[in-house]
Amino acid sequence: MIPYGKQSISEEDINEVVKVLRSDFITQGPLVPKFEKKISNYTGARYCVAVNSATSALHIACLALDLGIGDYLWTSPNSFVASANCALYCGAKVDFVDIDESTFNISISELEKKLEVAKAENKLPKIVVPVHFSGASCEMERIFELSKIYGFKVLEDASHAVGADYKSTKVGSCQFSDMAVFSFHPVKIITTAEGGVVLTNNQNFAEKMRTLRSHGITKDSESFVADFSGPWKYEQQDLGFNYRLTDIQACLGISQLKRLDEFVAKRRDLARKYSDEFRDVSGIEIPSTDFLETSSWHLYVIRVKSSAKREPLFNYLRNQGIGVNVHYIPIHLQPFYKNLGFKKGDFPSSEDYYE
């Protein structure tokens, strides 16, 4: 079976992990900050905070942006549920913005219309989470412009887009956002087994997230509230979590990062070949070639024009040993979100894309 997604682990990756297993620190050692620094250098963002998953990254990013009860977070229905769940973890409400029918990312025109309505109703979002579906960046410059007009923060869910480009920057630079999140799950571009990071250019956000990922505890004496002495001193200043990444995972990430550009180049080459081969095949639609050289191509999505033929094709390919998958069932159509009041017909472009 050709899997839907699979990590690429080299002998160098294995050797680096073995070195850490033989070292003094397998967690809370020097390699997590080293990994963070390398990701910062790659993307151009000033700060990077590594955690145990992209879901955790979205959660602490929302908390650092003070999302809470009474607030709204907007995101795309065409994503994994974590893009929306992060709002609910904070006690906030979630809503969605329908997608563009050619890019399958958040529709700028739908966002503009929804913001005007929300302004009139005094229900503007505190955070908007654009999702870079399949590895192609949303129109971040325009979204960032809208954030200045309407007063919301921008948190990029770039889980699919490690190594992707946008205009003259790397996705994750946060040139047009307040924060960006990467995923290092094994099916993504590079892996740390499980893991994720938050990138930002705001020092206060970074410091807040570093505290939140480790139980809300700080050992920075300059930030202590109480007047205690002793080199053993630490303070819990917030209600945090155990979202730490281990040194074992960080060293794998450091090793994988050396091949990131190679991985992305190979994915772009495959996307180019797929597009050439499938362009004249009847009954299907292939992805837009507008972002052929900028997407990281986490996914190459073929749309079957007849929904009645999708499942037979899916089963046929699986039976031929090709591990295809379907992305995504719109979040608002999940039973949990239907119980929150969402229903079929709320976001027709996302529903049409899925169907």
Language model feature labels by segment:
Residues 32-37, 45-49, 55, 109-113, ...:
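PLP-dependent aminotransferase class I/II
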Residues 25-72, 86-90, 96-98, 120:
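Phosphate-binding glycine-rich loop
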Residues 63-149, 153-158, 165:
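PLP-dependent aminotransferase-like
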Residues 175-219, 247:
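Active-site PLP attachment segment
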Residues 3, 127, 181, 197, ...:
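Short aromatic/hydrophobic contact patches that present stacked aromatics
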Residues 49, 74, 95, 154-155, ...:
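Structural detector of well-ordered beta-strand residues that form the stable sheet scaffold
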Residues 1-25, 30, 234-237:
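N-terminal "arm"/small-domain region of PLP-dependent enzymes with the aminotransferase-like
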Residues 156, 160-191, 232-236:
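Conserved active-site segment immediately N-terminal to the catalytic lysine
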